[in-house]
Swiss-Prot record:
Keywords, sorted A to Z: DNA-directed RNA polymerase, Magnesium, Metal-binding, Nucleotidyltransferase, Plastid, Transcription, Transferase, Zinc
Lineage: Eukaryota, Viridiplantae, Streptophyta, Embryophyta, Marchantiophyta
Enzyme class, first EC level, given as a word: transferase
Protein name, as recorded: DNA-directed RNA polymerase subunit beta'
Subcellular location: Plastid
Originating species: Aneura mirabilis
Similarity annotation: Belongs to the RNA polymerase beta' chain family. RpoC1 subfamily.
The record's free-text note on cofactor binding: Binds 1 Mg(2+) ion per subunit. Binds 1 Zn(2+) ion per subunit.
Cofactor(s) listed in the protein's UniProt record: Mg(2+); Zn(2+)
Length: 699
């Protein structure tokens, strides 16, 4: 077991065979060393007690019942002050049964077996270090290929190099006759190797420092190489450079952590504690078991068969031994990661066995389910719904959830204000939903941020801080613009609520994790708070033109303009002096969101038009020298000195409302920045015309 105060971090790395043996082996008071599992048995079919030397043996893993040995001679737990009691008859430690949760065993394999994670997981660590194709190594591991001279520094008698297939007729005629003679086992193992033994010998022969230096020199040569002029050639060079970089990094990690590469080939296989792979007895003597037990049994069966073949190697055909080595490799692969890049092993009901990797990975794996997915105090969970009326940094917290999360703070407020004499009275008042409870709760949440988290938390924006607002119902109200960081939508997604308790956590939530401080992507720098889906539809409906078109209801610039002007009766378009007049008329229902109007605009403006040098549709003159130039989207009032007195733009009520909201948002965000008012009318090909240019045009 790991002491959580003494050890503050956990590192997962390769274990050496000696370390695996130290995990499992222990010396009993009678001098016997136990820990090795040699039999594929689990429980006796009648008594349901662990079998001897099996996967549940009490002598190896500890007693099933606390303080009770197999023979029943002792039935008491040893005291902590005394030496651990030990049954001399059956050899079981008289300790608590919880020890079966972390006491391990091991299986001594008859042949080296490669670890499937480091061979078949992409990118393959073994293939990267040995600088060989992965398919070639897989064929070698499964005994489809043989390698000659696996250890380079030793002398050889055969002039063999590289790989060859045992299935070739020439090799099948020569090698059985040559290697079947007695006394040639050492010579045979030195000259020719296959399976995990061949991989292990090549890894032992590696010099990591020379591998790093050689890879670095090759990388420098590739960096000096000029472009080939073709995409395929450039991609090939880049792939080779990436491969060399991975090889250098991998070699560096092995050197820094003092891990030997040959540890990626297993000679001892750890056996998990029985409580992590249980067998449970149901009614009427029926047993259900973990899939790991069946996979362990298959490994032991095949390993024991290989041991028998090797013990009778003089009379056992060489091909049968090689085939059995392949079966042992496949059994260990299925135990560690069943079905990786191949067909998985299945039970009698055609269901794939759950391997060690399946128990660790995934949403229901050991890490996410038991270590990362623990229940946390001061947390809750509910469905999210849209809250468009909320500010960006606020969220709607259901009253029922808020009173549970902040109950301790409310109780402290009640007792501190002498509204409740003790804890029990305060809880009674909370259950009674007294009006003062909600007032105190409102005061508490105004000064206390909360954290919202949506699983899976793939980046730091998966957890953001918000200022809560009490809402009715049972759903969390969330502003739609913050959904991009959470990758959330409102089709039934759930989010977790956490209350930061310490002062440091609250300061971090306010200064770093508040949603309005995380509007840009930390990876790309692009904005995250972008309107989408229903927001775009709403903006489109708000700013859309009327059925006749905002640009065509008064004037038309088509080729048949004169005929159009004669036959068309101009509607009366209202004039407004400012935003306030538009708001009042809209509230009094004199105009609607799509009504066209003339709005007085500032003269120090910047405007976008669709025509580079647009000519006025109509010019009106007064006796005082004032003229009115009417364009497609705006009209100008110009005095006798050719100066612009006033400007009216043709727009809609919806666009006025939208522009005002954008203007208020910009002023609230950038109060100190000076800006020029901008009105967006026209299409994408519009250009900017400033008031200075217009004044110069009319002078």
């Amino acid at each position: 077991m790991i002491h959580r105060i003494k050890y503050q971090r956990l590192r997962i790395e390769l274990a050496s065979p000696e370390q695996i043996r130290n995990w499992a082996e222990r010396k009993l008071p009678d001098g016997e060393i136990v820990g090795r599992v040699t039999k594929p048995y689990t429980l006796h079919y009648k008594t349901h007690k662990p079998e001897k030397d099996g996967l549940f043996r009490e002598r190896i893993f500890g007693p099933v019942r606390s303080g009770v040995c197999i023979c029943g001679r002792y039935k008491g737990i040893a005291s902590g002050k005394e030496t651990t009691k030990f049954c001399e008859h059956c050899g079981v430690d008289l300790t608590r049964s919880r020890i079966r949760r972390y006491r391990m065993g091991y299986i001594e394999l008859a042949c080296p077996v490669t670890h499937v994670w480091y061979l078949k997981r992409l990118p393959s660590c073994i293939a990267n270090l040995l600088d060989k194709p992965l398919k070639e190594l897989e064929s070698l591991v499964h005994c489809d290929l043989f390698t000659a001279r696996p250890i380079n520094e030793k002398p050889t008698l055969l002039k063999l190099h590289g790989l060859f297939k045992y299935e070739d007729q020439s090799w099948r005629d020569v090698f059985p006759r040559f290697f079947s003679c007695g006394g040639f086992e050492i010579f045979r193992d030195r000259e020719i190797a296959t399976g995990g033994d061949a991989i292990k010998k090549q890894l032992i022969d590696l010099d990591l420092q020379s591998v790093m230096s050689h890879a670095h020199s090759e990388w420098e040569e590739l960096t000096k190489q000029e472009s080939t002029g073709t995409d395929w050639g450039d991609r090939k060079i880049q792939r080779n450079k990436d491969l060399l970089v991975r090889r250098m990094k991998l070699s560096k990690y092995f050197v820094q952590t003092n891990i030997e590469p040959e540890w990626m080939v297993l000679s001892l296989l750890p056996v998990l504690p029985p409580e992590l792979r249980p067998m449970i007895e149901l009614g009427e003597g029926e047993l259900i078991t973990s899939d790991l037990n069946e996979l362990y049994r298959r490994v032991i069966y095949r390993n024991n068969t290989l041991l028998d073949f090797l013990a009778r190697s003089d009379s056992t055909p060489r091909g049968l031994i090689i085939c059995q080595k392949r079966l042992v490799q496949e059994a260990v692969d299925a135990l560690i990661d069943n079905g990786i890049r191949g067909q998985p092993m299945r039970d009698n009901h055609n269901r794939p066995y759950k391997s060690f990797s399946d128990l660790l990975g995934g949403k229901e794996g050991r890490f996410r389910e038991n270590l990362l997915g623990k229940r946390v105090d001061y947390s809750g969970r509910s469905v999210i719904v849209v809250g468009p009326s909320l500010p960006l940094h606020r969220c709607g917290l259901p009253r029922e959830m808020a009173i549970e999360l902040f109950q301790a703070f409310v109780i402290r407020g009640l007792i501190g204000r002498n509204l409740a004499p003790n804890l029990r009275a305060a809880k009674t008042m909370i259950r009674g939903n007294k009006p003062m409870i909600w007032k105190i709760l409102q005061e508490v949440i105004e000064e206390h941020p909360i954290l919202l988290n949506r699983a899976p938390t793939l980046h730091r924006l998966g957890i953001q801080a918000f200022q809560p607002v009490l809402v009715h119902g049972r759903a969390i109200h969330l502003h739609p613009l913050v959904c991009s960081g959470f990758n959330a939508d409102f089709d039934g997604d759930q989010m977790a609520v956490h209350v930061p308790l310490s002062l440091e956590a609250q300061v971090e939530a306010r200064l770093l994790m508040l949603s309005r401080r995380n509007v840009l992507s930390p990876a790309t720098g692009e904005p995250l708070c972008i309107p989408s889906q229903d927001m775009l539809l709403g903006l489109y409906a708000l700013t859309m033109e009327n059925r006749r078109g905002i640009y065509g209801n008064k004037y038309s610039l088509d080729s048949n303009k004169e005929t159009y002007l004669k036959n068309f009766s101009f509607p009366k378009i209202p004039y407004f002096h400012g935003y306030e007049d538009v708001y009042k008329a809209h509230q009094q229902r004199e105009i609607h969101s799509h009504s066209v109007l003339w709005l007085r605009w500032q003269t120090n403006f910047r405007m976008i038009t669709s025509t580079p040098r647009e000519e006025p549709i109509e010019i009106q003159y007064e006796t005082s020298g004032i003229s009115y130039r009417i364009y497609n989207h705006y009209q100008l009032e110009i005095n006798a000195q050719r100066e612009i007195i006033s400007i009216y733009i043709c727009t809609t009520v919806g666009r006025v409302l939208f522009n005002q909201r954008i203007d208020e948002a910009i002023q609230g965000t950038c109060q100190a920045s000076s800006r020029q008012t901008m009105l967006y009318i026209g299409n994408k090909e519009d250009r900017f015309l400033s008031s200075e240019k217009l004044n110069r045009r009319y002078k």
